[in-house]
Amino acid sequence: MYNLADMKIYTHYTKITEKEGFRWRTLLHFGNSWDILGSVVMKNPGSAAVSCPVADAQVLQALRFFDGNKTREIWYEFTPDPTMYCVRDLFSEYHSIHTHEELNGVIQIFNLLYIRDAHLERALQKVAQLGSKDLTDYDVSHLVPPVYLGFSDLGKCATYQDTAQRFFHAALAQGMKCYNEDFFKNKFYHPLFLMRYARNTTYGLKARLQFIQNTTEPTTDG
């Protein structure tokens, strides 16, 4: 497993109030490479907090790639939250099977909405009050497989269903065969639930293996 220092979190952030803001284009960085290792789509940014603006010139140069070499937005380093560790662990399992190596590169995090709050209901209320950035076109066009869809039931509610389905169809087009082609037959387990609370359950193991083996009918052989 990794220590805190082995995972860096970089993101854009716009402060609204002392406790509220928009967080988007979040990257989990491991090792020395900046190659994209995959993408995850979730509900909304959680409890991870701003640490400081990124000042390292080499890091900033690497991050500009993720902005299409545009530098208008400030990059910040954030402290990780429990969900980020679960994303790390899920992709670590994936890459240990496919490459037999530790993570070395970037995992992209996308969301259905971008208000930062660990409590989804509060985040939804804030969206209603403050509005939110619509980054769906940008996000969908920047998905890189493997793509884990972990937005749970929020993706099936009326407000966010269209956005979730755009990510879903983009993932299918990118060759992700771990999802049922019928959108509504998928569970889309959130990584925190999958890797912590459901980790030792039969359905949790099946969901992990579906993603790792990229099939709806995984095997447990070997």
Predicted features along the sequence, with ranges:
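Residue-level detector of functionally special positions within alpha-helical transmembrane segments
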Residues: 42, 111, 190-193
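Surface-exposed cleft-lining segments at the edges of enzyme active sites
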Residues: 50, 67-80, 116-127, 154-155
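Catalytic metal-binding/acid-base residues of hydrolase active sites
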Residues: 44, 113, 154
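A short, N-terminal amphipathic alpha-helix
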Residues: 82-101
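Conserved acidic residues
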Residues: 37, 105, 144-148
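Glycine/proline-rich loop-helix segments at beta-alpha junctions forming the active-site rim
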Residues: 116-222
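Active-site and ligand/interface coordination hotspots across diverse enzymes
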Residues: 1-75, 220-222
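Short connector loops at secondary-structure junctions
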Residues: 101-121
